[in-house]
A protein has these predicted regions:
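Glycine/tyrosine- and acidic-biased, solvent-exposed loop/turn segments at the edges of beta-strands
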Residues: 1-110
Length: 110
């Protein structure tokens, strides 16, 4: 079953499947200004990049409906502000780097 695309007069496009935002081969929402949102089964989700890309350059990473990124900040605003999240939990940059270092060390040991 393929998602159904709805295009609005203002140029916005939305893909739905079973009443939920859903698209596996691209963003499920595309705004006329170029902003894009990736959804799977109604949840913000993207494994190979940010799940939200705003036209101004702001990027936000989500996985299974939770803010999440393991290799850097999960939110990078156009003004340079950054926020770190793992599994929906906000961390300071220092906390994030500590968790990342611990994971890297565990990977080396195994």
């Amino acid at each position: 079953m393929k998602p159904k695309m709805i295009t609005y007069a203002d140029g916005m496009k939305y893909w739905y499947m079973n009443g939920k935002l859903h698209r596996e081969d691209g963003p499920a929402i595309e705004w006329a200004d170029g902003t894009k949102f990736w959804y799977l089964n109604g949840k913000l989700h993207r494994e190979d990049g940010p799940a939200v890309e705003y036209a101004d350059g702001t990027k936000r990473w989500w996985l299974n409906g939770k803010r999440h990124r393991e290799d850097g900040p999960a939110a990078e605003w156009a003004d340079g502000t950054k926020f770190w999240y793992l599994n929906g939990k906000e961390l300071t940059e220092k906390e994030f780097n500590k968790v990342r270092l611990k994971k890297n060390l565990q990977d080396l040991i195994q």
